[in-house]
């Protein structure tokens, strides 16, 4: 047993308190994710105006729509897909975003679905662009390259919050014994950090490569969608399935099933892009 294995014993998921309000590391990490994605997008607009011909004020307005769509979609998606008591929220919809418990104590909003957030993001992007659909693919591409590094902070936040834990490490896994984290009395894979690397860093490198080697609007979001789906599918083998869900056919988790659906959506966007997008002129 090494110091890393017992790291959860060394810190508290609560970063600090403001009176009766407890501020969790995840909340801070999510704020870092938003800031990172925002300024990454601004940098891309500045460095490559031919691929991203968007004014800053225009982007700021779109970013607000996109973020709102992500939050709404992520929360509603969790309620519909993962929440065992989803029927309660469907009849008490005001409770979906209620950050207080039955005693009036602030507990924050818990339970977000990445794939639900993706649906919300796509809907918000379409609604914002409906008056000028020529820019829809440009907006999607911009988010595709600015989101992954911000996503890293989100998964680190999950790790610090000691949630979405990994599967139990087999006793014969030498690497697992080294990198595993004690959760309760069991050694588990640090699946949140595995996801941060695969779904954040690796996917970013994929999209960055696509940016350098493609000249058609809409291809970056396709590469992001396909890359994320693949990396999430792999990472799910190290992540403990939600207790209320378990696994389905072929022992696939819900995350893996949704990732396969994400592949279909990405291919649909590819078809749309090939029919409606124009070549990007000039050097990138």
Curated annotation (Swiss-Prot):
Asked if the Swiss-Prot or TrEMBL record annotates the protein with the keyword Cell inner membrane, the reply is yes
Main subcellular location of this protein, as a coarse class? membrane
User: What pathway is this protein said to act in by its record?
Assistant: Protein modification; lipoprotein biosynthesis (diacylglyceryl transfer)
Q: Which GO terms describe its molecular function?
A: phosphatidylglycerol-prolipoprotein diacylglyceryl transferase activity
Protein's cellular compartments: Cell inner membrane
Positions that bind a 1,2-diacyl-sn-glycero-3-phospho-(1'-sn-glycerol):
155
Which EC main class describes this enzyme?
Answer: transferase
- What keywords would UniProt list here? Cell inner membrane, Cell membrane, Membrane, Transferase, Transmembrane, Transmembrane helix
A Pfam family that this protein carries is LGT
Residue spans crossing the bilayer: 14-34, 62-82, 106-126, 136-156, 190-210, 218-238, 252-272
The record gives the membrane topology as: Multi-pass membrane protein
Per the record's keyword annotation, is Membrane included, yes or no?
A: yes
Q: Which Enzyme Commission number(s) are listed?
A: 2.5.1.145
Q: What does this protein do?
A: Catalyzes the transfer of the diacylglyceryl group from phosphatidylglycerol to the sulfhydryl group of the N-terminal cysteine of a prolipoprotein, the first step in the formation of mature lipoproteins.
The protein in question is named Phosphatidylglycerol--prolipoprotein diacylglyceryl transferase
Q: Which organism is it from?
A: Helicobacter pylori (strain Shi470)
């Amino acid at each position: 047993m090494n110091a890393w294995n017992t790291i959860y014993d060394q810190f508290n998921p609560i970063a600090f308190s403001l009176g009766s309000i407890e501020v969790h590391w995840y909340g801070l990490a999510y704020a870092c994710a938003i800031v990172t994605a925002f300024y990454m997008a601004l940098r891309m607009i500045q460095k490559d105006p031919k691929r991203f011909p968007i004014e800053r004020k225009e982007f700021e307005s779109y970013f607000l729509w996109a973020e709102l769509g992500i939050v709404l979609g992520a929360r509603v998606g969790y309620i519909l897909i993962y929440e065992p008591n989803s029927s309660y929220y469907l009849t008490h919809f005001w409770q979906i975003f209620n950050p207080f418990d039955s005693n009036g104590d602030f507990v924050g909003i818990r339970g977000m679905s990445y794939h639900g957030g993706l649906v919300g993001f796509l809907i918000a992007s379409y609604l914002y662009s409906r008056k000028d659909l020529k820019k829809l693919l440009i907006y999607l591409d911009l988010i595709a390259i600015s989101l992954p590094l911000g996503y890293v902070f989100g998964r680190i936040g999950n790790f610090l919050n000691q949630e979405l834990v990994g599967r139990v490490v087999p006793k014969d896994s030498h690497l697992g014994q080294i990198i595993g984290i004690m959760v309760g009395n069991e050694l588990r894979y640090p699946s949140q950090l595995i996801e941060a690397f695969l779904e954040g860093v690796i996917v970013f490198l994929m999209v960055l490569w696509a940016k350098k080697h493609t000249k058609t609007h809409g291809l970056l979001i396709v590469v992001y969608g396909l890359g994320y789906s693949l990396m999430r599918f792999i990472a799910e083998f190290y992540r403990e399935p939600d207790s209320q869900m378990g696994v389905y056919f072929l022992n696939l988790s819900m995350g893996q099933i949704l990732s396969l659906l994400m592949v279909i959506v990405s291919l649909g966007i590819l078809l749309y892009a090939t029919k409606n997008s124009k070549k990007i002129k000039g050097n990138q």
